[in-house]
């Protein structure tokens, strides 16, 4: 029989190395060497609040063969043509591609944009991805970087809506406005004019997982502004992501709503890691936070818009089983009792924070 000391060592090694080689999303599909023969199985693998997202499952495959872009009258074979069709589509790519869009790409509902098997880059100095009043969208294995602002101009929003004049956009990588059931998984996002992901204007049922966020200051905004009450119903899961290197703040920054931040790995931040205003509920569980070297940047959290500490004392911000490195610390507040936030289809196992580096080792694009 193994000695108690040996068992303790094995448990420790398991926690940090071998026993958490895959998180529950990756173990759902990546272990199958023939995943490309059953691409749509991916839609069964989401967890958290976006777990019901089907994307283009059950629809036809659509193959992008051209990097061209016509914002008003897209041609078959281009990404914009597939993304704006009314029917469910699973969009794949015929080869490696660098796509510079001329105007924001509106993604219609029931779409999967699946970059697996190719090296797909979006942005490159042009505007990027936009979703408005749609549901069931999956974005997977895309490099999205260098997204820039756009000017006022006409854009095909979808087959049913047609062409509309679109206001100038800020240069986000991914914008979601009044979107339900969306899953953003295994993308690499960096270096855009504004944010990397914005989830606003009543969006809910969102999972953001296995992404790599780096070389960017304002990473992720959840909630429109402090006066937009519809965001009180927002529910977002942020899990298994790698934040950094060189990620400044907003990982995420929430207004209202409920945000579960689980098993993410944080490199040193520039200002703060997790922040919010307007009384969001933030449940931090099993994350690994490595603080910057500066003593005044050690706090993980930042409460915004509080006239005094007592003004935010009832906000429910809770840290459970997080790992804190180099002096990092989380300031909790509000009620601390456990709550069951997920139904049986949404729930997933969250490991202790010391396992987060291993669970996020494959974050970002997979091919």
UniProtKB/Swiss-Prot annotation:
<feature type="region of interest" description="IgE-binding. Binds to IgE in 5 out of 7 patients tested">
    <location>
        <begin position="251"/>
        <end position="258"/>
    </location>
</feature>
<dbReference type="InterPro" id="IPR011050">
    <property type="entry name" value="Pectin_lyase_fold/virulence"/>
</dbReference>
<comment type="function">
    <text>Has low pectate lyase activity.</text>
</comment>
<keyword id="KW-0106">Calcium</keyword>
<feature type="disulfide bond">
    <location>
        <begin position="306"/>
        <end position="312"/>
    </location>
</feature>
<feature type="disulfide bond">
    <location>
        <begin position="128"/>
        <end position="147"/>
    </location>
</feature>
<keyword id="KW-0479">Metal-binding</keyword>
<dbReference type="Pfam" id="PF00544">
    <property type="entry name" value="Pectate_lyase_4"/>
</dbReference>
<dbReference type="GO" id="GO:0045490">
    <property type="term" value="P:pectin catabolic process"/>
</dbReference>
<dbReference type="InterPro" id="IPR002022">
    <property type="entry name" value="Pec_lyase"/>
</dbReference>
<feature type="binding site">
    <location>
        <position position="170"/>
    </location>
    <ligand>
        <name>Ca(2+)</name>
    </ligand>
</feature>
<keyword id="KW-0020">Allergen</keyword>
<feature type="binding site">
    <location>
        <position position="198"/>
    </location>
    <ligand>
        <name>Ca(2+)</name>
    </ligand>
</feature>
<feature type="active site">
    <location>
        <position position="250"/>
    </location>
</feature>
<keyword id="KW-0325">Glycoprotein</keyword>
<feature type="disulfide bond">
    <location>
        <begin position="28"/>
        <end position="45"/>
    </location>
</feature>
<dbReference type="GO" id="GO:0030570">
    <property type="term" value="F:pectate lyase activity"/>
</dbReference>
<protein>
    <recommendedName>
        <fullName>Pectate lyase 1</fullName>
        <ecNumber>4.2.2.2</ecNumber>
    </recommendedName>
</protein>
<keyword id="KW-0732">Signal</keyword>
<dbReference type="GO" id="GO:0046872">
    <property type="term" value="F:metal ion binding"/>
</dbReference>
<dbReference type="InterPro" id="IPR018082">
    <property type="entry name" value="AmbAllergen"/>
</dbReference>
<comment type="similarity">
    <text>Belongs to the polysaccharide lyase 1 family. Amb a subfamily.</text>
</comment>
<feature type="region of interest" description="IgE-binding. Binds to IgE in 3 out of 7 patients tested">
    <location>
        <begin position="317"/>
        <end position="327"/>
    </location>
</feature>
<feature type="binding site">
    <location>
        <position position="194"/>
    </location>
    <ligand>
        <name>Ca(2+)</name>
    </ligand>
</feature>
<dbReference type="InterPro" id="IPR012334">
    <property type="entry name" value="Pectin_lyas_fold"/>
</dbReference>
<feature type="glycosylation site" description="N-linked (GlcNAc...) asparagine">
    <location>
        <position position="148"/>
    </location>
</feature>
<feature type="region of interest" description="IgE-binding. Binds to IgE in 5 out of 7 patients tested">
    <location>
        <begin position="92"/>
        <end position="104"/>
    </location>
</feature>
<feature type="region of interest" description="Beta-helix">
    <location>
        <begin position="38"/>
        <end position="305"/>
    </location>
</feature>
<keyword id="KW-1015">Disulfide bond</keyword>
<feature type="glycosylation site" description="N-linked (GlcNAc...) asparagine">
    <location>
        <position position="178"/>
    </location>
</feature>
<feature type="region of interest" description="IgE-binding. Binds to IgE in 6 out of 7 patients tested">
    <location>
        <begin position="239"/>
        <end position="250"/>
    </location>
</feature>
<dbReference type="InterPro" id="IPR045032">
    <property type="entry name" value="PEL"/>
</dbReference>
<keyword id="KW-0456">Lyase</keyword>
<feature type="signal peptide">
    <location>
        <begin position="1"/>
        <end position="21"/>
    </location>
</feature>
<comment type="pathway">
    <text>Glycan metabolism; pectin degradation; 2-dehydro-3-deoxy-D-gluconate from pectin: step 2/5.</text>
</comment>
